[in-house]
A protein has these predicted regions:
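Extended intrinsically disordered or low-complexity regions, especially N/C-terminal cytosolic tails and loops
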Residues: 1-74, 78-82, 226-438
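Amphipathic, non-membrane alpha-helical segments in soluble helical-bundle scaffolds
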Residues: 46-57, 75-82, 142-145, 149, ...
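Generic structural signal for well-ordered, non-membrane alpha-helices
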Residues: 55-62, 66, 87, 91, ...
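Short, flexible helix-adjacent loops and helix caps
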Residues: 69-73, 97, 189
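Short, hydrophobic, well-ordered secondary-structure elements
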Residues: 75-101
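Eukaryote-specific, cytoplasm-facing alpha-helical/coiled-coil scaffolding segments in long proteins
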Residues: 90-92, 110-123, 207-213, 227-238
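Flexible secondary-structure boundary motifs
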Residues: 96, 100-171, 180
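Charge-enriched, short contiguous segments at helix-coil
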Residues: 157-226
């Protein structure tokens, strides 16, 4: 081997100096080359696909992961991997479509004539679909004929109607995914970092796993159901200070205090995952980031301990994607969203006005969308999926009809009698209504 070729091989084996600055603590001073390569390998090792994912999708994903690891030697590979991840989404959807329909599907052509297509792979289906000038397939639990163009756009619509992808924020992300795919396919030179490449791979892994029915613990897009602990929220009515802790810890102190307490089920795992809005809890309205359930109160510490020991409430798990909320608009005021069961227990005077049942991943989006509707802002959909907000309006009208629609949409409308109690932080940060001028 010549000296020149030896130097060329050594250059290919050397860690790219740019990768050394991407540390577990963020950008910083350079790590050792071996440590930098090991860190990137350990990152990508966390991305695991479910066992039942289609083999062709798995092979492509593993190829991307291998390319990511090699980015330690060639920094440009991070850009190539991130771009290829955008294109791989369509392959995953194609493979899931082929598996879902089991090799046979009935389609409609433009004249509404039906054709049965028997296929072995998605490309096989696609060729036959074009040949019969297919335009529609049946989608969803209602088996409704819907337009299907067999491209990424149509596949994403199909996956959502079949319940294989979900979440209203993810619906907006899907629109961005389509734009990114097109930008990648017709783009120009650009350079991405390992952070962006890993995010692309991580998101792709979550989407693929969810297409095959598996959520991701701690996931960004499709998180697994999260644990709600029994939490005591206490506040000082004089100073307005608010504290929170596990209800089981209330009995650990011998003395009583002057705080007012309520007990709720809420996401509360200090150091792991907390609800950022827990201190703004309102028993009647949805003000927390994750669903919170009223259990007891208000009362003193002694009373809270007594109820907790007698009732022995247990933690549970909850899913916060695609929740259903109801929200009231009355006399120019947009009120805070409520959970359907709580709204069902309202007195007649509190039921007046126009109500909306809205599907969303959190109450903030519901409130913002309803405020936009009340202010007659352009572009917001009064029914169905909103193009501007990550929400879907299910129904509007009086409370009774809206609750009935919420139940049909899968929401639990069992009546929950909640007291009119909220923390001082809620009074300060989250007014119960705003006045809107249309």
């Amino acid at each position: 081997m010549t000296t020149t070729s030896t130097h060329a091989l050594a250059g290919l084996q050397a860690v790219d100096p740019r990768i050394l600055h991407f540390t577990p603590l963020g950008l910083g001073g350079p790590m050792q080359a071996e440590d930098a390569a090991d860190y990137q390998q350990r990152l990508v090792a966390n991305l695991v696909l479910a066992d039942d994912v289609a083999q062709t999708t798995r092979q492509k994903f593993e190829q991307l992961c291998a390319g990511y690891v090699q980015g330690a030697l060639c920094y440009d590979l991070f850009t190539l991997v991130a771009d290829a991840a955008q294109l791989t989404l369509e392959q995953a959807l194609r493979d899931r479509f082929a598996a879902h329909h089991g090799g046979m599907i009935t389609v409609q052509d433009r004249a509404a004539c039906e054709h049965q297509i028997i296929y072995t792979t998605y490309p096989d289906f696609y060729e036959q679909y074009k040949k019969v000038r297919g335009s529609k397939i049946r989608m969803g639990t209602s088996n409704t004929w819907r337009g299907f163009n067999a491209t990424l756009d149509g596949l994403l619509l199909w996956a959502r109607r079949e319940g294989l992808v979900r979440g209203q924020r993810n619906r907006h992300n899907e629109r961005a995914k389509k734009a990114l795919r097109n930008l990648t396919a017709h783009g120009t030179f650009h350079l991405l970092t390992p952070v962006e490449a890993y995010r692309a791979l991580s998101d792709l892994a979550e989407i693929i796993n969810h297409l095959w029915g598996h959520s991701t613990p701690g996931g960004r897009l499709y998180p697994a159901p999260i644990t709600r602990d029994v939490v005591a929220i206490g506040w000082d009515n004089t100073t307005g200070s608010v504290v929170a802790g596990h209800a089981a810890q209330l009995a650990l102190e011998d003395k009583d205090d002057e705080l007012t307490y309520i007990l709720v089920r809420a996401v509360f795992s200090p150091g792991e995952r907390d609800d950022p809005n827990l201190m703004e809890y309102d028993a009647r309205h949805a003000t927390t980031h994750f669903p919170a359930q009223y259990l007891w109160g208000p009362g003193s510490r002694t009373q809270a301990i007594a109820w907790f020991e007698q009732a022995a409430p247990e933690p549970d798990i909850c899913d916060h994607l695609d929740q259903v909320f109801v929200v009231r608009v009355h006399e120019g005021r947009v009120h805070l969203p409520m959970y359907p069961g709580v709204a069902g227990a309202l007195q007649q005077a509190e039921r007046q006005g126009t109500w909306y049942a809205i599907r969303a991943d959190g109450p903030a989006e519901v409130f913002a969308h309803t405020r936009a509707l009340s202010a007659t802002e352009s572009g917001h959909a009064r029914m169905g999926e909103c193009p501007h907000c990550p929400v879907e309006t299910i129904a509007s009208g009086d409370l009774h009809s809206v609750l009935r629609a919420a139940q049909t949409a899968g929401s639990d409308v069992t009546t929950v009698v909640a007291p009119d109690v909220r923390t001082p932080f809620a009074d300060l940060m989250v007014p119960r209504f705003i006045t809107v001028s249309s």
